[in-house]
C-alpha cells in the first residue's frame, strides 16, 4: 500500500459513517398521537431516542410560536422521558412569494385573490421575525436543525431559484450567527420539490448553515424516481435530516426500498436521523403510525449484524 493510500484510510472511514440503526430513528409527534404525553409514550414504546416537533399534538399551534415558558416545559417533559429533538419543522416560506403567480391558485375569484395577496405579503414581511422565533424555539428545545420551504410552486421553478436564493441569503446569515442549520425540504407544492431543484439551490448558496431535509417520496409528484436517481443528484454533505412518508414503507404503489436507501446513506457518511412523517390522514392516522414505525424498525434491524440486532417490537 502506498503512503498516499495509507493516509487516505482515516478520511475514508469518516466518510463511510456508522450504520443505520434504531438510535437514528425519529418521528413527528403530531402525526403519531393526539397529545404530547401520548406521543412520548409512542416514542418510548419503540425505544426511540429522538422526536421531530412541528405542531403541538392535538393542536394547530407550531412549537415555534409557543412562549418561552411553554417551550421550556415541553423541553423538560421530553428530557425527563429520555428524548431529544432531532428536528424542528416550521412552515417558514411555505406560501406564495409576492409578485409570483403560483400554479395552484390560477382559478381564484378576485375577492379570494385580494385576500390571499394581502396575507402573503404580511407573511413575507415578517419572515425574519418568524425565523428568529424558530431559532429561539430551537435553542430552548435543544436542536440546531430547522425546516424551511421555498414558496408556493410556479410554472417555471428553476427560473425563480436565483430570487429564492437572494431571499434566503440574509436568513442563512442569521442562522450562521445563531449556530443553527436551515434545512430546505423538497416539497411537492413548493418551488424546490425534486432532488435536481435541491441540488441547484444548494449550489447557489454554499453555506454549511443551509442544508437539506430530504423527503424522499415528495419528488414523485413531479415524476422523479427518488432512489437511486434523485438521491444521486444530492450533495450528500448537505443532507441534515431525512423524512420517511408512511406510504413509502408500507406495501403499495408508493413503496420505496428503504433498506437500500439506508445502506447507501450509511456508505455516504450520513450521520443524521430519519423521521417518520406518517401522512396517512383520517381516523386511521395513529394506527398507521404504529404500522409504519414497526416496519421501519424491522428494516433497520434486518440490516444490523446478527449479534447487534435489536429485538422486535
Regions found by a protein language model. Give the residues of each.
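Histidine-acidic metal/acid-base catalytic patches
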Residues: 6-10, 20-25, 33-49, 79-81, ...
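Active-site acidic/histidine proton-transfer and metal-coordination neighborhood
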Residues: 11-17, 42-44, 80, 93-211
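Short catalytic-loop micro-motif centered on adjacent basic/acidic residues
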Residues: 25-29, 182-186, 251
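Active-site-proximal loop/turn and secondary-structure-junction residues that shape catalytic pockets
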Residues: 31-33, 55-57, 91-94, 150-154, ...
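Aromatic/hydrophobic pocket-lining residues that form π-stacking "cages" and hydrophobic walls in ligand
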Residues: 39, 74, 134, 171, ...
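Conserved beta-strand positions in the central sheet of alpha/beta enzyme cores
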Residues: 52, 87-89, 147, 243, ...
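Glycine-rich, proline-tolerant flexible connector loops at the mouths of alpha/beta enzymes
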Residues: 54-75, 151-156
